[in-house]
Amino acid sequence: MNRKNIAKGKLVRRFGINIFEQPKYDKLLKKKPNPPGMHGRSRRAKITEYGKQLIEKQKVKFTYGISERQLTNIFKEARRQHGVTGDNLLALLERRIDNVVYRAGFAISRAHARQIVSHGIIMLNGRRVTIPSITLRANDIIQVKEKDSLKKLVRSNIEKTSTLRKLPTWIEVNADDLNVKITRPPSRDEIPTLANEQMIVEYYSKRA
């Protein structure tokens, strides 16, 4: 196991949840349910409210593979929008182009999806893009660049992930033409619960 996998494994154990949504980490949590450095029935130290908020924020950062600055900016945008700030925050994260590539099964992980976008393999509304943080809107269409080797790679990824991941209802995936259409923004109940978004809102609200 390489250093990157070890680091991810430690994060999963620290948070007690499979934030990377990959089967091998479910197995790890079953085998080692305690956080790194804690063995047996040792009691966790009492966590402050701030500590709890920080943990939830970190879950989201590592889940989506974004920086502190990126998450801060996404929170500010979520707060400007109408509706519930926490719901808006998660919807914005889900509509990142790298996340949609991941959700569609075009990539085996979000890190892989970021790489695919960064390398210019994905087209957005007919134009090549290389920025993983682009936020997609309703009726946007992404597709794989016209190159046989790239299409072969993506089709292989779709096959690998088809039994592991359920396609979101707010996107339409054409596996034959390798394109994805955003039909609408996701609602809160369509987004997997990996963190308590209200605690994240409270964390940033105190620092605004």
UniProtKB/Swiss-Prot annotation:
Molecular function GO terms recorded: rRNA binding; structural constituent of ribosome
Domain S4 RNA-binding: start-end pairs: 95-157
SUPFAM superfamilies: Alpha-L RNA-binding motif
GO biological process terms, semicolon-separated: ribosomal small subunit biogenesis; translation
GO CC terms in record: small ribosomal subunit
InterPro entries: Ribosomal_uS4, Ribosomal_uS4_bac-type, Ribosomal_uS4_CS, Ribosomal_uS4_N, S4_RNA-bd, S4_RNA-bd_sf
Quaternary structure note: Part of the 30S ribosomal subunit. Contacts protein S5. The interaction surface between S4 and S5 is involved in control of translational fidelity.
Function, in words: One of the primary rRNA binding proteins, it binds directly to 16S rRNA where it nucleates assembly of the body of the 30S subunit. With S5 and S12 plays an important role in translational accuracy.
Entries under PANTHER family matching the protein: 30S 40S RIBOSOMAL PROTEIN, SMALL RIBOSOMAL SUBUNIT PROTEIN US4M
Name the UniProt record assigns to this protein: Small ribosomal subunit protein uS4
Gene: rpsD
